[in-house]
A protein has these predicted regions:
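Structural preference for beta-strand elements that scaffold enzyme active sites
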Residues: 22, 82-84, 116-118, 140-142
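Canonical radical SAM enzyme core domain
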Residues: 53-67, 92-137, 145-149
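Conserved alpha-helical substructure of the radical SAM core
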Residues: 46-82
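Auxiliary Fe-S-binding modules of radical SAM enzymes
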Residues: 1-18, 71
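Canonical Radical SAM [4Fe-4S] cluster-binding loop centered on the CxxxCxxC motif
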Residues: 19-61
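Short, basic/glycine-rich phosphate-binding loops at helix/coil junctions
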Residues: 43, 80-82, 147-152
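A short acidic, helix-capping loop that chelates divalent metal ions and anchors anionic groups
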Residues: 50-51, 151-157
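Short glycine-centered, acidic/aromatic-flanked micro-motifs in structured strand/loop junctions
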Residues: 27, 85-87, 121
Length: 157
């Protein structure tokens, strides 16, 4: 399997079977992977193989990048079905996740009110109230908590 490291906070769009034309938001460093798990099936590879040297994008950097792309797509009549938090690791691990979600919902409504906002997450940070509050704002939570202990079932992570 090839490894993908997303070099920008905003990537795509990609054509998704589930989500349609989907613009991605990567809240992790652009040069590596930061995730609470190390799943064998992850397209970003293993954490140890891609240790980042750069910092995570700031809330302002994400907002500016997202607005630029959304405005351009809107002005050029390019369709968009979904904005998806995904990328180089676990998006809910970003310290400003809730604020970034709030900004994303605002910009989505402004430029593509018919589009959805989705989060691909391994659900490890849902114990944090702020993460739960942020997840309640989005349209589509795609949460997948894989087992991490062999005696509890199939454990890909």
């Amino acid at each position: 399997m090839s490894t993908i490291i997303y070099p920008s906070p905003i990537f795509g769009p990609v054509n998704s079977r589930r989500l349609g034309v989907s613009l991605g938001i990567n809240l992790m460093p652009s040069d590596g992977k930061v995730c609470s798990f190390d799943c064998v099936y992850c397209e970003c590879g293993f954490n140890a193989d891609f240790r980042p040297k750069k910092k995570r994008p700031t809330r302002e950097e994400v907002r500016e990048g997202l607005e630029k792309v959304l405005k351009e797509r809107h002005d050029n009549n390019q369709p968009l079905d979904d904005i998806t938090f995904a990328g180089n690791g676990e998006p809910t691990g970003h310290p400003d996740f809730k604020g970034i979600v709030e900004d994303t919902m605002e910009l989505c409504k402004k430029y593509f009110p018919e589009a959805q906002v989705s989060v691909l997450s391994n659900a490890t940070y849902i114990y944090k109230e702020e993460v739960r509050e942020a997840l309640m704002l989005v349209d589509n939570n795609i949460l997948k908590l894989s087992c991490t202990m062999q005696d509890h079932g199939r454990c890909p992570c």
